[in-house]
């Protein structure tokens, strides 16, 4: 059985512990004074908890001191065996002041290291990358944006752009490297994007995920900070999917290409079950449904779920929010309840208190049962890159079997 990775969160905050905000950062322009809670699945009796008030805004405080990180490491190892340590942070891991010392200490214990999501903005010397590899770093997740240092300086606030890219190249030559590129229309798309991915292929990167830029509340900026950049109109979901396909078709033989919110051309996600080639599997799943329910989702998942539950006793309705996990109480308030059945499934990670969701969805006098759905029905491009087509389909089958079981348990039975 594969041993799990130990996650060590070094804390820190975007904009403070990352050498300054990138222009496109999801957390830029967020007002951290007197944050108001959204409500979420972790809230107890009242609306508001650490997660939906502070964590969602990455209000974490400064980096934790090195002794605290080592103490967390040692205490975790008392109870479970791990093969690798995943270093992550609310700030940028590369900006952690004792990163080399921490990695050296982890290496002395005999564990390998994954540098979680980093932009490399804290690396001011390529020797740092070499030392980290010597200290056991064998996997890196790197936010690239572009291999053009001028674009990194302008859009990522990267004062060490050339050095950061040299470090990235060294990591690519010596580690497993997964790269991320937030794609902004007219800035780093088109030929710039192809040049960046071509460089990553030449350097030896293992995978690249293209991430659609969000610039409005319905696209996912729920923290009151939209727009991030005035005058930029993000790609539509379909335009973005076409970009992912184009990059995959040109470079997919040399590097794994995925996209979020759409899609993974190799794994066939999200919602591989909606593909015609899997219709026979879908029909078998549909035959197991004997309850009635409504599923509330977002713009991206809606056409897939609508197709999956077509001609069943389950209907799917959407709110005007691209990503279902970012649905808030405000979105639910705009729903026309005439299409909502007596059992309602909301996304498990939706930012709404359970009691508030019930009040909103019962405002027409119908005493509806409100249930949070299955944790993950499909694989997003951020995680699907390590799955084969068969593994991704198996994941979805198991997830939908769980959901159907919940529908049959909570849903009003068909007459």
Swiss-Prot record:
Its cofactor is [4Fe-4S] cluster. Pathway: Protein modification. Binds at least 1 [4Fe-4S] cluster. This cluster is coordinated with 3 cysteines and an exchangeable S-adenosyl-L-methionine. The keyword 4Fe-4S applies. Coiled coil: none annotated. Signal peptide: none annotated. This is [Methyl coenzyme M reductase]-L-arginine C-5-methyltransferase. [4Fe-4S] cluster binds at residues 18, 22, 25. Belongs to the radical SAM superfamily. MCR alpha subunit C-methyltransferase family. Radical SAM methyltransferase that is responsible for the C(5)-methylation of 'Arg-274' of the methyl-coenzyme M reductase (MCR) subunit alpha McrA. This post-translational methylation, despite being not essential in vivo, plays a role for the stability and structural integrity of MCR. GO terms for molecular function: 4 iron, 4 sulfur cluster binding; metal ion binding; methyltransferase activity. It catalyses: L-arginyl-[methyl-coenzyme M reductase] + AH2 + 2 S-adenosyl-L-methionine = (5S)-C-methyl-L-arginyl-[methyl-coenzyme M reductase] + 5'-deoxyadenosine + L-methionine + A + S-adenosyl-L-homocysteine + 2 H(+). Residues 2-256 form the Radical SAM core domain. GO terms for biological process: methylation. The keyword Metal-binding applies. InterPro entries: Aldolase_TIM, MA_4551-like, rSAM.
């Amino acid at each position: 059985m594969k041993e799990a990775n130990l996650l060590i969160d070094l804390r820190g905050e975007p904009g403070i512990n990352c050498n300054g905000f990138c222009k496109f950062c999801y957390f830029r322009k967020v007002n951290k004074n007197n944050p108001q809670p959204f409500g979420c699945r972790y809230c107890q009796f009242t609306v508001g908890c650490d997660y939906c008030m502070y964590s969602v805004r990455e209000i974490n405080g400064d980096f934790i001191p090195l002794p605290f990180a080592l103490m967390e490491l040692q205490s975790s190892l008392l109870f479970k065996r791990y093969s690798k340590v995943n270093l992550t942070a609310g700030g940028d891991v590369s900006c952690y002041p004792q990163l080399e010392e921490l990695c050296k200490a982890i290496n002395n214990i005999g564990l390998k290291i994954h540098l979680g999501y980093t932009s490399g903005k804290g690396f001011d010397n390529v020797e740092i990358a070499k030392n980290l590899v010597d200290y056991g770093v064998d996997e890196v997740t790197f936010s690239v944006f572009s291999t053009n240092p001028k674009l990194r300086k302008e859009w990522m606030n990267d004062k060490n752009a050339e050095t950061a890219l040299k470090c990235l190249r060294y990591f690519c030559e010596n580690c497993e490297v997964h790269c991320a590129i937030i794609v902004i229309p007219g800035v780093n798309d088109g030929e710039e994007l192809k040049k960046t991915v071509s460089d990553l292929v030449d350097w030896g990167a293992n995978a690249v995920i293209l991430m659609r830029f969000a610039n409005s509340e319905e696209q996912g900026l729920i923290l009151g900070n939209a727009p991030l950049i005035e005058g930029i109109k993000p790609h539509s979901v379909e335009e973005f999917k076409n970009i992912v396909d184009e990059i995959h078709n040109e470079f997919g033989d040399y590097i794994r290409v995925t996209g979020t919110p759409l899609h993974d051309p190799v794994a066939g996600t999200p919602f591989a079950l909606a593909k015609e080639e899997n219709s026979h599997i879908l029909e078998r799943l549909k035959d197991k449904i004997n309850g009635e329910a409504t599923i509330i989702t977002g713009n991206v998942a809606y056409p897939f779920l609508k197709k999956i539950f077509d001609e069943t006793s389950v209907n799917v309705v959407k709110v005007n929010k691209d990503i279902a996990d970012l649905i808030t109480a405000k979105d639910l308030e705009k729903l026309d309840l005439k299409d909502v059945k007596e059992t309602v499934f909301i996304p498990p990670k939706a930012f709404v208190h359970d009691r508030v969701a019930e009040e909103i969805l019962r405002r027409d006098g119908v005493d509806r049962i409100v249930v949070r759905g299955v944790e993950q029905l499909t694989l997003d491009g951020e995680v699907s890159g390590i799955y084969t087509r068969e593994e991704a389909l198996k994941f979805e089958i198991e997830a939908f079997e769980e959901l159907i079981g919940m529908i049959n348990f909570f849903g009003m039975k068909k007459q």
